[in-house]
Amino acid sequence: MTWDGELKQVPYHELSAGQTRDGREVFHSEEEDYLKSVQSSVDKESKNYLNSVYINQKILPKELNVKERDSAGYVTELLADGKTLEGESFRKGMGLTSANFTIQNIGNQVRFLCKGRGHGMGFSQYGGNELAKNSNSAEEILAYYFPSMEIQEITEIF
């Protein structure tokens, strides 16, 4: 798949939070402008859509708050005892299924309620599978998840 005639990576994830993420918002760069946010509401029907992760309060910062989210609802920045943390790095470090989460204090535990699975960029495997079940072709599915990109034969590129 290409964007402006250039071969590009096409990221995928298991299950979005109902909308995929915009590359420019995530990477703050025009180079990833080809990754457009699209609705993938069918993902919300998956049995794996919501996931709870419980972590003992003792191992977390005393103050932990979401500072910023992107347009798809994924946490991009958190404040941890006054320090700014990047959302996706926090997700990976804490073993969360998604950076689209809410934080709840429950007794001596902190509950992270996560929507979706993975980074949420590009192709949703669950959403793509559901589109295929509805007789959409591979080309139609890729065009849906990568609307600004073009499918080209490799011989056309090189």
Where are these regions (language model features)?
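Conserved, single-site charged/polar hotspot
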Residues: 1-158
